[in-house]
Curated annotation (Swiss-Prot):
UniProt feature, compositional bias: Polar residues: 498-515
GO cellular component terms listed in the entry, alphabetical order: nucleus
Organism: Emericella nidulans (strain FGSC A4 / ATCC 38163 / CBS 112.46 / NRRL 194 / M139) (Aspergillus nidulans)
Annotated protein name in UniProt: GATA-type transcription factor sreA
Location within or outside the cell: Nucleus
Biased composition regions of type Low complexity, renumbered to the chain: 309-331, 485-497
Segments forming GATA-type zinc fingers: 106-130, 251-275
Function statement: GATA-type transcription repressor that regulates iron- acquisition genes through specific binding GATA sequence elements of target promoters. Iron acquisition regulation is critical for survival under both iron-limiting conditions (to acquire essential iron) and iron-replete conditions (to limit iron toxicity). SreA targets include genes encoding a number of key iron-regulated factors such as those involved in siderophore biosynthesis.
Factors inducing expression: Expression is induced in mycelia grown in high iron medium or transferred from low iron medium into high iron medium, and repressed in mycelia grown in low iron medium or transferred from high iron medium into low iron medium.
Keywords of this entry: Coiled coil, Metal-binding, Nucleus, Repeat, Transcription, Transcription regulation, Zinc, Zinc-finger
Biological process annotations from GO: intracellular iron ion homeostasis; negative regulation of iron ion transport; negative regulation of transcription by RNA polymerase II; positive regulation of transcription by RNA polymerase II
Taxonomic lineage of the native organism: Eukaryota, Fungi, Dikarya, Ascomycota, Pezizomycotina
Domain remark text: The conserved cystein-rich region (CRR) localized between the zinc fingers is also involved in DNA-binding and transcription repressor activity.
Amino acid sequence: MLASIPHMETLRSLPRNPDVVARHPSAEDLDAAQQLISSAQAGREHPQDRHYTDNGSRKSEAGAPHSHHEGEYPIVQTSETPMNGHHVEKTSPKSQKDTSFLGHSCSNCGTKSTPLWRRSPTGAMICNACGLYLKARNVARPTKRNRTQASPEAYHPQNQSVGSQPDPAVTGSEGCTGSCPGGGNCNGTGGAEGCDGCPAYNNRVYKSTARGNVAAHALNRAGNSDAVPSPEAEAPARNSGQPEGNMLVACQNCGTTVTPLWRRDENGHPICNACGLYYKLHGSYRPTTMKKTIIKRRKRVVPALRENSPTAATHSSHGSSASPEASSPATLAYSHDERHRYYSSEPVDQYHRISPAAQRPFGFAPPPVDFTNFNSGAVTLPHHPPPPRLLEPGHPPLSQFARRSISPSSSGNSKKRTLAEAGANTDTGPVPTTLEAGSNQLPPIVSSANPPPPARLSSISSILNHAHARDESRLDPSLAALGRQQQSQPHHPQSSPLAPTQAASQSLPGVSNMDNHVEDRRAKLQREAEEMREQLRAKERELAELAGQ
């Protein structure tokens, strides 16, 4: 590999364009070459670091030749794995290209590969994991978290510390038979239908099949350096690495191996989620008497599944009441139609004869203009006389728009009226059909025969305009005359359809009435101007008195 470095530098230094003069190697190229050389030297000095994933017997066989043949590392491999040794030597520089400077080792955990080298407050070189741990917790990262550390001296104290713990590891290994009852009561062993995505399912148990072989090899090397282990410890190690893998993770406080989330205490020891939350809230360790064998999970309801179910509006999968969002559009439309029929006081048989296609456009139409205070506070200019067709006294509202124009829902009033009040506003006798069928004019919206509801819909206008002091001088004389005629003439329900038209034609204002209206309007404006002048003089006198003081 060293022989290939000058060749690579020669190829890199060749110019791509023949017109360009050949350049010298830059500082970056020299730095890259120096890193490759240092990585090759580090591989020869520490060959045992590359065989921790192999069997312990292979390591013992290859240990002696490495000390004598230091420069012939690819050749001194045993006959069993010549290709494996060549592969390790070939891929070792590539696996260490993530480091910023090769040849370093973490002063805390001893690792030689990390995505980012950091500096401790004392100036020592530490890896990225130890640096982040130190920055977050202000304490050194525990070395037992480093999984790449494989020396027998490092595994010996771990086995002693784990072995000193009582029965939690045994219960964890015995509980891996898949006896979870499910239904929200979880013991972390799996076996139920919903255990696949359960957070309380111990991830050490869940992923033990992928890590079993590595854990078994590591513990076998630890067993070779110690005295003769007990048969109880050798049998699980030969079968699978699951019990040993589970023994490495247990709560330091209560000893449980089942938790939705593993936490760390202030000393870096693993604790379960319950003990961690208890310590965070109360500031003291959780009593062991509070330990439970079953973790109760919260029942989470998915809204999408509940809406798609056929019985979403009336039933729930967990026995809870249905939410307001689950009501169907048909129910909302039905309630809207019932409210509209309640306000319009239509007969039941007439309401059911109307087709749904005819009802739907009116339900989504914009609200009409409020003509509630038309008769009481309207002031008509002299050059804009009111249209005679819309002021005929004998015509009640003919269509659904007229009923909606005086309803509280269209006028913005949220107070409901009783059926008696609604019936009093719309009880005007039979509706003539000749004008609606043959006329191209709009139906009358408000007339003198259908006054607004007393003391409710015009309450704001009565407060502002002072109904007790109102006189007919503010109204149009033609409107006042029509109102007096309507009050003097009794209403005949059995009159013919042509009778209202004849009465309206006899009571239409003439040219003389318009002249009288202009004169009255001029006199009224003169009186108002005189009153304003008098008020202005009074204000000027007050200002003069204040200035004199």
